[in-house]
């Protein structure tokens, strides 16, 4: 197994890389199997944190507003990671959001990775749950604040080392780097007609928002318009 990698975890506003956004990135640089450096940031999405996500992560709107723009966050992660392979628990999920954000901001991201979830499925098939929290409990790894990016990235690194120590000799093929793939669909920008209608709706219904309308995609604008019409009604 590689002894130098970056363990990463992200928190997001939902489950869809296309529709939802990065809320937090946490990363841990590992060299010779030991933590060398850590990096992390909250991200200001410009949108309120959904109640379910706020309850799950503990990330509030005040915390979100203290974060950096997504461009700065993605650039910071790419600089921290360099060209090292990644590691994480269900890493394809994290990679999909990172790749989507990178492409949106005109950056590139390709990676090989070790997925502790995939490794656990090969080495611990009898376990009823292979969630990060369940595996941390099994190996007595302190999980820190669950569903916070930095702590989950650290937990994934420690779990990877535990799995390697126990199963590296028995199941070496489980610890081979795998290429990560995620295809980003082309997003059309918001139309001038949508901009005008959305601004009119916000003004008419006296809705305050942190969202930058100019940066929205066509599909994002459509969803926001539909949501306002459903919750507040048409302009009379």
Task: Please provide the spans of the model-predicted regions.
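Conserved non-catalytic scaffold segment of RNase H-like nuclease domains
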Residues: 1-111, 125-147, 173
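Short, glycine/acidic-enriched loop or turn micro-motifs at the edges of active sites
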Residues: 12-14, 118, 155
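A short, structured active-site edge motif that brings together acidic residues
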Residues: 111-123
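Acidic, divalent-metal-coordinating active-site segment for phosphoryl/phosphodiester hydrolysis
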Residues: 148-161
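Acidic two-metal-ion nuclease catalytic site recognized across multiple nuclease folds
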Residues: 159-236
